[in-house]
Structures are given as structure tokens and as C-alpha cells.
A protein has these predicted regions:
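Extended beta-solenoid/beta-helix repeat architectures
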Residues: 1-103
């Protein structure tokens, strides 16, 4: 069961349950393994997704989307993408990503 988070949240936060994030997080958001996040709001920081996690970004991340080997799809906006494991981040045609930084 997915929980909804809304409003203004002071981060950093670690997501340990399947979550739909609608609000604004000031700070980094870390998604743990085996957890799914649907991001419709904004992260004013980095979105860090651990191996085995799932993140679907419809909203915006002002910092980097850092993928440690998770299933990550960006259809919104991100400052940058860093793929640090497989599979690589999927970036849809409508997404806006300022830069991609693969090691």
C-alpha cells in the first residue's frame, strides 16, 4: 500500500515505505531498496535511489538524481543524473535534464 506525503517537508528524509510524494522537500531524499516512490512534487536537493529501489519522477529535482542501480524513470525535471550502477536511468522524451554525469 502506497502512502501519500504532501506539504512542505524539511529534509533530508529517507523513504522506507512505498510513497507518493506530492509536496516539497527541502533537502535530500533517499529511497531505500525494495521501496517505490512516485514523485509528483519537488525535491530541493538530491534524489538518491539505492540498489533495488524504484523512483518515478513526474515532478522536479533541483539537484542530482543519483541512481545506485535502481529502476529510475524521469519524465519531469532534474538538475543532473548520475548512474552509479545498472540499470541506467530512463529519461523520457518529455523530460528536462540539465546534465548527465556518468562515471
Amino acid at each position: 500500500m502506497m502512502i501519500d506525503l504532501d506539504g512542505h517537508i524539511e529534509g533530508p528524509i529517507t523513504v522506507t515505505r512505498d510513497t507518493a510524494l506530492w509536496g516539497i522537500v527541502t533537502g535530500d531524499v533517499t529511497v531505500k531498496a525494495d521501496v517505490r516512490v512516485q514523485l509528483y512534487g519537488k525535491v530541493r536537493g538530491n534524489l538518491i535511489v539505492e540498489r533495488g529501489g524504484v523512483a518515478v519522477l513526474h515532478g522536479a529535482v533541483s539537484g542530482a538524481v543519483i541512481n545506485h542501480g535502481a529502476h529510475v524513470v524521469i519524465s519531469g525535471k532534474a538538475g543532473s543524473v548520475q548512474d552509479l550502477g545498472d540499470p541506467p536511468t530512463q529519461i523520457t522524451r518529455d523530460a528536462i535534464v540539465a546534465s548527465r554525469d556518468d562515471p
